[in-house]
Amino acid sequence: MFAYLKKKESGIPTEELRITVPKVKTAENSALSLDRTAKLYIGGKQTRPDSGYSLNVVNADGSLAGEIAHGNRKDIRNAVEAAHKACGWQSSTPHLRAQILYFLAENLETRGEEFQNRIMKLTGVSKKQAGHEVETAVRSIFSYAALADKHEGLIHQPPMRGLALALNEPIGVLGLVCSDEAPLLGMLSMLLPAIAMGNTVVLVPSRPFALVATDFYQVLETSDVPSGVINIVSGDAEELCSVL
């Protein structure tokens, strides 16, 4: 009578079923494994090269470090035009330039480990040597920030009656080409005195160490450096210099 209440055998074992789920690679540290082509830095923003091509950069051990944008004649022209448009930097107060350089040094210092690792891989130097270069680079920015508002003019007394004023004025737009030594410090040693005195620059980084310059883009973007003051065009240095 109550047969319908009895538990029917379903034919499926009552033991716990175990389902094997394949392991899926998570996105942890995916940003480090992404292969991206670095852009140029013109007019305060990252831009694609006119040619659409890129160049490989290798580490000291021969492995591929990444790619850099292959700038050409048009990119240099755009960078020079952007530098001329940033003429307000020349008339800015030395105090303002000093404050921006201080901020630049602080932002570079917070990313010191990142630059240290990059220098180690590109040059093959020890961790201590790479760290020393980063520390020296940060101190250099602080030093030029302190000097920015101390480069004052002079008052001369000529042989004739009266006074003569000697004023320090920026040159204007400077073209800078980095050497193949000291990836970070070498670049900043050319860049800092130029912008501290009110000049705008178009910089061509060293091809073997150009990734240090492209990493520097993010430091510039977070340091309130006005658009067009610093323009960086990577590529074949000989080709770019002939245009610059």
Residue ranges and their predicted role:
Residues 49, 93-96, 129, 186, ...:
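Short, surface-exposed helix-loop/turn micro-motifs enriched in polar/charged residues
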Residues 56-63, 116-119, 196-197, 223:
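Short acidic (Asp/Glu) and glycine-rich catalytic loops that position anionic groups and cofactors
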Residues 2-64:
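Hydrophobic face of amphipathic alpha-helices that form TPR/SEL1-like repeat modules
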Residues 53-54, 69-72, 208:
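A generic structural motif
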Residues 61-150:
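Glycine-rich loop-to-alpha-helix module at the N-terminal edge of alpha/beta enzyme cores
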Residues 120, 150-244:
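Rossmann-like NAD(P) dinucleotide-binding subdomain of oxidoreductase/dehydrogenase enzymes
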Residues 50, 76, 112, 130, ...:
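Alpha-helix N-cap/helix-start motif
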